[in-house]
Amino acid sequence: MQSAWANPILLLVLTTLIWAGHSIVGRLAVDQIGPMTLTCLRWGIALIPILLTARPALRRDWPVLRTHWRYMAAMGALGYTGFNALFYVAAHRTSALNLSIIQGAIPALVLIGARLFLGARFTALQGLGALTTMAGVVAIAAQGDLNRLAALAFNGGDVMMFIAAILYAGYTIGLRERPHVSGLSLLAGMALAAFITSVPLMIWEIAAGGFIWPTAAGYATLVYVALGPAFVSQIMFMRGVELIGPGRAGVFVNLVPAFGAIMAVVILGEPFAAYHVVALILVVSGIAIAQRGSGGGRH
Protein backbone atom coordinates (compact mmCIF):
# COMPACT_ATOMS: atom_id res chain seq x y z
CA MET A 1 0.00 0.00 0.00
CA GLN A 2 2.85 2.35 0.87
CA SER A 3 4.53 1.79 -2.52
CA ALA A 4 1.23 2.34 -4.36
CA TRP A 5 0.69 5.61 -2.46
CA ALA A 6 4.12 6.75 -3.65
CA ASN A 7 3.49 5.79 -7.31
CA PRO A 8 2.05 8.84 -9.13
CA ILE A 9 1.50 6.99 -12.43
CA LEU A 10 -0.62 4.31 -10.76
CA LEU A 11 -2.58 6.86 -8.73
CA LEU A 12 -3.33 9.08 -11.72
CA VAL A 13 -4.27 6.21 -14.04
CA LEU A 14 -6.66 4.87 -11.39
CA THR A 15 -8.06 8.38 -10.98
CA THR A 16 -8.80 8.71 -14.69
CA LEU A 17 -10.36 5.23 -14.75
CA ILE A 18 -12.74 6.27 -11.97
CA TRP A 19 -13.60 9.49 -13.79
CA ALA A 20 -14.16 7.61 -17.05
CA GLY A 21 -16.32 5.07 -15.23
CA HIS A 22 -18.56 7.92 -14.10
CA SER A 23 -20.01 8.19 -17.62
CA ILE A 24 -20.74 4.47 -17.70
CA VAL A 25 -22.41 4.52 -14.29
CA GLY A 26 -24.38 7.62 -15.30
CA ARG A 27 -25.94 5.64 -18.14
CA LEU A 28 -26.52 2.58 -15.95
CA ALA A 29 -28.36 4.80 -13.45
CA VAL A 30 -31.10 5.66 -15.95
CA ASP A 31 -34.48 4.50 -14.56
CA GLN A 32 -32.69 3.15 -11.45
CA ILE A 33 -32.50 6.41 -9.48
CA GLY A 34 -33.57 9.98 -10.25
CA PRO A 35 -30.83 12.38 -11.45
CA MET A 36 -31.47 15.01 -8.75
CA THR A 37 -31.77 12.35 -6.06
CA LEU A 38 -28.46 10.89 -7.24
CA THR A 39 -26.82 14.33 -7.18
CA CYS A 40 -28.05 15.14 -3.66
CA LEU A 41 -27.42 11.77 -2.03
CA ARG A 42 -24.02 11.49 -3.75
CA TRP A 43 -22.74 14.51 -1.84
CA GLY A 44 -24.59 13.61 1.33
CA ILE A 45 -22.85 10.23 1.47
CA ALA A 46 -19.48 11.52 0.22
CA LEU A 47 -19.44 14.11 2.99
CA ILE A 48 -18.98 11.41 5.63
CA PRO A 49 -15.53 10.12 4.52
CA ILE A 50 -14.50 13.57 3.29
CA LEU A 51 -15.17 15.22 6.66
CA LEU A 52 -13.52 12.37 8.57
CA THR A 53 -10.41 12.61 6.38
CA ALA A 54 -10.29 16.40 6.41
CA ARG A 55 -11.03 16.88 10.12
CA PRO A 56 -7.50 17.92 11.21
CA ALA A 57 -7.18 20.32 8.26
CA LEU A 58 -10.66 21.75 8.87
CA ARG A 59 -9.82 22.60 12.47
CA ARG A 60 -6.87 24.62 11.23
CA ASP A 61 -8.58 26.21 8.21
CA TRP A 62 -12.07 26.85 9.60
CA PRO A 63 -11.57 30.60 10.31
CA VAL A 64 -10.52 31.16 6.69
CA LEU A 65 -13.31 29.01 5.25
CA ARG A 66 -15.90 30.83 7.34
CA THR A 67 -14.91 34.20 5.89
CA HIS A 68 -15.09 32.78 2.35
CA TRP A 69 -18.45 31.04 2.67
CA ARG A 70 -19.94 32.83 -0.35
CA TYR A 71 -17.07 31.63 -2.53
CA MET A 72 -17.43 28.08 -1.21
CA ALA A 73 -21.19 28.10 -1.82
CA ALA A 74 -20.81 29.40 -5.37
CA MET A 75 -18.08 26.91 -6.26
CA GLY A 76 -19.92 23.95 -4.75
CA ALA A 77 -23.12 24.92 -6.56
CA LEU A 78 -21.36 25.50 -9.89
CA GLY A 79 -18.76 22.76 -10.15
CA TYR A 80 -20.38 20.04 -8.05
CA THR A 81 -24.17 20.46 -7.95
CA GLY A 82 -24.65 22.11 -11.35
CA PHE A 83 -22.23 19.88 -13.22
CA ASN A 84 -23.49 16.63 -11.68
CA ALA A 85 -27.18 17.46 -12.06
CA LEU A 86 -26.79 18.29 -15.76
CA PHE A 87 -24.49 15.30 -16.26
CA TYR A 88 -27.04 12.83 -14.87
CA VAL A 89 -29.92 14.40 -16.83
CA ALA A 90 -27.79 14.28 -19.99
CA ALA A 91 -27.11 10.58 -19.33
CA HIS A 92 -30.85 9.96 -19.85
CA ARG A 93 -30.65 11.44 -23.34
CA THR A 94 -27.30 10.54 -24.86
CA SER A 95 -24.72 7.77 -24.84
CA ALA A 96 -21.88 7.22 -22.36
CA LEU A 97 -19.56 7.48 -25.36
CA ASN A 98 -20.77 11.01 -26.10
CA LEU A 99 -20.64 11.96 -22.41
CA SER A 100 -17.01 10.84 -22.20
CA ILE A 101 -15.85 12.62 -25.35
CA ILE A 102 -17.69 15.89 -24.65
CA GLN A 103 -16.19 15.94 -21.13
CA GLY A 104 -12.81 15.98 -22.83
CA ALA A 105 -13.56 19.54 -23.97
CA ILE A 106 -13.29 20.92 -20.42
CA PRO A 107 -9.55 21.82 -20.63
CA ALA A 108 -10.19 23.70 -23.89
CA LEU A 109 -13.15 25.52 -22.36
CA VAL A 110 -10.95 26.52 -19.41
CA LEU A 111 -8.44 28.08 -21.82
CA ILE A 112 -11.17 29.93 -23.72
CA GLY A 113 -12.90 31.11 -20.53
CA ALA A 114 -9.66 32.32 -18.97
CA ARG A 115 -8.94 34.32 -22.12
CA LEU A 116 -12.44 35.84 -22.34
CA PHE A 117 -13.02 36.66 -18.68
CA LEU A 118 -9.55 37.05 -17.19
CA GLY A 119 -7.63 38.29 -20.20
CA ALA A 120 -5.22 35.38 -19.80
CA ARG A 121 -2.82 34.89 -22.67
CA PHE A 122 -2.22 31.53 -24.27
CA THR A 123 0.28 30.28 -26.81
CA ALA A 124 -0.45 29.45 -30.45
CA LEU A 125 -0.22 25.74 -29.59
CA GLN A 126 -2.73 26.14 -26.77
CA GLY A 127 -5.09 27.95 -29.13
CA LEU A 128 -4.68 25.24 -31.75
CA GLY A 129 -5.32 22.59 -29.11
CA ALA A 130 -8.52 24.31 -27.96
CA LEU A 131 -9.81 24.61 -31.55
CA THR A 132 -8.97 20.97 -32.26
CA THR A 133 -10.79 19.82 -29.15
CA MET A 134 -13.86 21.92 -29.96
CA ALA A 135 -13.89 20.45 -33.47
CA GLY A 136 -14.19 17.04 -31.82
CA VAL A 137 -17.18 18.21 -29.79
CA VAL A 138 -18.83 19.58 -32.94
CA ALA A 139 -18.26 16.23 -34.66
CA ILE A 140 -20.09 14.50 -31.80
CA ALA A 141 -22.94 17.03 -31.71
CA ALA A 142 -23.47 16.81 -35.47
CA GLN A 143 -23.03 13.02 -35.47
CA GLY A 144 -20.84 13.40 -38.54
CA ASP A 145 -23.72 14.98 -40.52
CA LEU A 146 -23.07 18.45 -41.95
CA ASN A 147 -26.80 18.92 -42.61
CA ARG A 148 -27.48 18.38 -38.91
CA LEU A 149 -24.80 20.95 -38.11
CA ALA A 150 -26.26 23.48 -40.56
CA ALA A 151 -29.75 23.00 -39.10
CA LEU A 152 -28.45 23.11 -35.50
CA ALA A 153 -30.38 19.88 -34.90
CA PHE A 154 -28.41 18.61 -31.92
CA ASN A 155 -29.23 15.90 -29.40
CA GLY A 156 -30.56 17.46 -26.19
CA GLY A 157 -28.35 15.25 -24.04
CA ASP A 158 -25.22 16.35 -25.91
CA VAL A 159 -26.20 20.00 -25.44
CA MET A 160 -26.78 19.45 -21.70
CA MET A 161 -23.42 17.72 -21.35
CA PHE A 162 -21.72 20.62 -23.11
CA ILE A 163 -23.41 23.11 -20.75
CA ALA A 164 -22.24 20.94 -17.83
CA ALA A 165 -18.71 21.10 -19.24
CA ILE A 166 -18.97 24.91 -19.41
CA LEU A 167 -20.03 25.00 -15.75
CA TYR A 168 -17.10 22.84 -14.74
CA ALA A 169 -14.72 25.00 -16.77
CA GLY A 170 -16.08 28.03 -14.89
CA TYR A 171 -15.50 26.20 -11.62
CA THR A 172 -11.92 25.39 -12.67
CA ILE A 173 -11.23 29.02 -13.54
CA GLY A 174 -12.73 30.03 -10.20
CA LEU A 175 -10.18 27.88 -8.38
CA ARG A 176 -7.61 30.56 -9.16
CA GLU A 177 -9.28 32.68 -6.48
CA ARG A 178 -9.40 29.89 -3.89
CA PRO A 179 -8.68 30.81 -0.27
CA HIS A 180 -5.34 29.75 1.17
CA VAL A 181 -6.42 26.49 2.76
CA SER A 182 -5.47 22.86 2.24
CA GLY A 183 -6.93 20.88 -0.64
CA LEU A 184 -8.82 18.65 1.78
CA SER A 185 -10.44 21.61 3.53
CA LEU A 186 -11.42 23.08 0.17
CA LEU A 187 -12.93 19.75 -0.95
CA ALA A 188 -14.86 19.43 2.33
CA GLY A 189 -16.22 22.97 2.16
CA MET A 190 -17.37 22.67 -1.44
CA ALA A 191 -18.82 19.18 -0.88
CA LEU A 192 -20.90 20.57 1.99
CA ALA A 193 -22.04 23.44 -0.24
CA ALA A 194 -22.90 20.94 -2.99
CA PHE A 195 -25.05 18.89 -0.64
CA ILE A 196 -26.92 21.95 0.67
CA THR A 197 -27.54 23.40 -2.81
CA SER A 198 -28.64 20.05 -4.23
CA VAL A 199 -31.33 19.46 -1.58
CA PRO A 200 -33.80 21.87 -3.30
CA LEU A 201 -33.26 20.02 -6.59
CA MET A 202 -34.16 16.70 -4.97
CA ILE A 203 -37.25 18.27 -3.37
CA TRP A 204 -38.26 19.67 -6.77
CA GLU A 205 -37.80 16.25 -8.38
CA ILE A 206 -40.07 14.67 -5.76
CA ALA A 207 -42.70 17.44 -6.08
CA ALA A 208 -42.67 17.17 -9.88
CA GLY A 209 -43.33 13.44 -9.74
CA GLY A 210 -39.93 12.53 -11.12
CA PHE A 211 -38.68 10.73 -8.03
CA ILE A 212 -37.54 7.14 -8.62
CA TRP A 213 -37.15 4.95 -5.57
CA PRO A 214 -33.64 3.51 -6.02
CA THR A 215 -33.40 -0.08 -7.18
CA ALA A 216 -30.51 -2.34 -6.17
CA ALA A 217 -28.64 -1.03 -9.22
CA GLY A 218 -29.56 2.51 -8.17
CA TYR A 219 -28.04 2.01 -4.72
CA ALA A 220 -24.91 0.47 -6.28
CA THR A 221 -24.62 3.50 -8.56
CA LEU A 222 -25.00 5.83 -5.59
CA VAL A 223 -22.24 4.09 -3.65
CA TYR A 224 -19.90 4.22 -6.66
CA VAL A 225 -20.37 7.93 -7.42
CA ALA A 226 -20.19 8.91 -3.73
CA LEU A 227 -17.05 6.96 -2.89
CA GLY A 228 -15.35 6.89 -6.31
CA PRO A 229 -15.55 10.18 -8.27
CA ALA A 230 -16.56 12.30 -5.26
CA PHE A 231 -13.99 11.04 -2.75
CA VAL A 232 -11.33 8.43 -3.64
CA SER A 233 -10.40 9.93 -7.02
CA GLN A 234 -10.07 13.41 -5.47
CA ILE A 235 -7.67 12.13 -2.81
CA MET A 236 -5.62 10.18 -5.37
CA PHE A 237 -5.45 13.14 -7.75
CA MET A 238 -4.29 15.46 -4.96
CA ARG A 239 -1.59 12.94 -4.09
CA GLY A 240 -0.54 12.62 -7.73
CA VAL A 241 -0.24 16.40 -8.05
CA GLU A 242 1.77 16.47 -4.82
CA LEU A 243 4.21 13.88 -6.23
CA ILE A 244 4.78 15.18 -9.78
CA GLY A 245 3.23 18.65 -9.95
CA PRO A 246 0.03 19.96 -11.56
CA GLY A 247 1.47 20.29 -15.07
CA ARG A 248 2.54 16.67 -15.45
CA ALA A 249 -0.50 15.39 -13.56
CA GLY A 250 -2.75 17.35 -15.91
CA VAL A 251 -1.51 15.30 -18.87
CA PHE A 252 -3.45 12.32 -17.53
CA VAL A 253 -6.75 14.04 -18.34
CA ASN A 254 -6.04 12.83 -21.91
CA LEU A 255 -6.94 9.34 -20.75
CA VAL A 256 -10.48 10.14 -19.56
CA PRO A 257 -12.26 10.34 -22.95
CA ALA A 258 -10.21 7.39 -24.25
CA PHE A 259 -10.97 5.18 -21.23
CA GLY A 260 -14.61 6.29 -21.28
CA ALA A 261 -15.01 5.41 -24.96
CA ILE A 262 -13.47 1.96 -24.45
CA MET A 263 -15.69 1.27 -21.43
CA ALA A 264 -18.83 2.43 -23.25
CA VAL A 265 -18.19 0.01 -26.10
CA VAL A 266 -16.99 -2.94 -24.01
CA ILE A 267 -19.30 -2.67 -20.97
CA LEU A 268 -22.43 -1.11 -22.45
CA GLY A 269 -22.06 -2.40 -26.00
CA GLU A 270 -22.63 1.07 -27.44
CA PRO A 271 -22.05 1.43 -31.20
CA PHE A 272 -18.75 3.06 -32.16
CA ALA A 273 -19.41 5.03 -35.33
CA ALA A 274 -16.84 6.62 -37.63
CA TYR A 275 -17.65 10.09 -36.27
CA HIS A 276 -16.83 8.82 -32.76
CA VAL A 277 -13.36 7.84 -34.00
CA VAL A 278 -12.84 11.27 -35.55
CA ALA A 279 -14.18 13.09 -32.47
CA LEU A 280 -12.08 11.05 -30.04
CA ILE A 281 -8.90 11.64 -32.06
CA LEU A 282 -9.63 15.38 -32.25
CA VAL A 283 -10.43 15.74 -28.53
CA VAL A 284 -7.46 13.73 -27.25
CA SER A 285 -5.08 15.36 -29.76
CA GLY A 286 -6.38 18.80 -28.84
CA ILE A 287 -5.77 18.19 -25.13
CA ALA A 288 -2.26 16.91 -25.88
CA ILE A 289 -1.44 19.90 -28.14
CA ALA A 290 -2.72 22.40 -25.56
CA GLN A 291 -0.76 20.63 -22.80
CA ARG A 292 2.40 20.80 -24.89
CA GLY A 293 1.77 24.47 -25.53
CA SER A 294 1.47 25.13 -21.80
CA GLY A 295 4.99 23.86 -21.19
CA GLY A 296 3.93 20.62 -19.46
CA GLY A 297 5.29 20.34 -15.97
CA ARG A 298 6.77 23.85 -15.84
CA HIS A 299 3.46 25.35 -14.58
Per-segment meaning from a language model:
Residues 37-48, 78, 84-121, 125-127, ...:
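Specific alpha-helical transmembrane segments that line the substrate/conduction pathway
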